[in-house]
């Protein structure tokens, strides 16, 4: 079946899929067809059917690549950013469009930091460790401290370690407080009060803690 799908032309695909319209197969057939076209770099064929189904994760990656390869670079770069800025690893099919996106200078320092933060918050430590390579040098100490208070929340109680009133420092403090509050709520409250004397926390972020 897979071989037969891969051999179908764009013109024949609707008829081929219609043969199985009373089964779950049409969507599966189209997904497989799209993946085969993307893997083969047949981008026009891919785009001809990309709106026919809700794309699988792998085909969503190919769709972003297809946009770039068929002339819609702005849409491709937007799609690549949306795919990259998640707290989990994407399929390898995303690698080419991610490389293109980075090569075009779209991975700035704040975007790299944002993905690192959401990965830590999702407890995806292995991914966070991988993402360190994309962080600007000035962000790396903050990344280490964020991971530290995530994995060992009591460290946020060491007030003298985090005296700088800087946005990323405030961010890691509040994350550490949130983690500490799960097991030691009274201590977390006391520590937060001490930090509030010297740090200008965003009221919305503070309320969410």
Walk through the language-model features, giving the residues of each.
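Alpha-helical solenoid repeat scaffolds
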Residues: 1-209
């Amino acid at each position: 079946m897979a071989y037969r799908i891969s051999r179908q032309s764009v013109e024949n695909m609707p008829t081929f899929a219609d043969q199985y319209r009373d089964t779950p197969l049409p969507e599966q057939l189209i997904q497989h067809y799209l993946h085969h076209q993307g893997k083969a770099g047949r981008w026009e064929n891919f785009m001809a059917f990309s709106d026919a189904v809700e794309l699988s994760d792998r085909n969503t990656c190919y769709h972003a690549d297809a946009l770039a390869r068929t002339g819609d670079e702005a849409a491709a770069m937007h799609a690549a950013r949306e795919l990259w800025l998640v707290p989990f690893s994407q399929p390898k099919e995303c690698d080419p469009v991610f490389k293109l996106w980075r090569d075009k200078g779209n991975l700035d320092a704040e975007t790299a930091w944002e993905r690192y933060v959401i990965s830590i918050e999702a407890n995806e430590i292995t991914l966070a460790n991988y993402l360190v390579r994309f962080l600007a040098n000035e962000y790396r100490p903050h990344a280490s401290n964020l991971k530290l208070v995530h994995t060992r929340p009591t460290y946020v109680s060491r007030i003298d370690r985090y005296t700088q009133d800087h946005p990323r420092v405030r961010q890691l403090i509040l994350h550490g407080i949130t983690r500490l509050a799960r097991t030691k709520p009274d201590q977390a409250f006391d520590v937060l009060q001490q930090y509030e004397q010297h740090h200008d926390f965003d009221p919305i972020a503070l309320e969410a803690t």
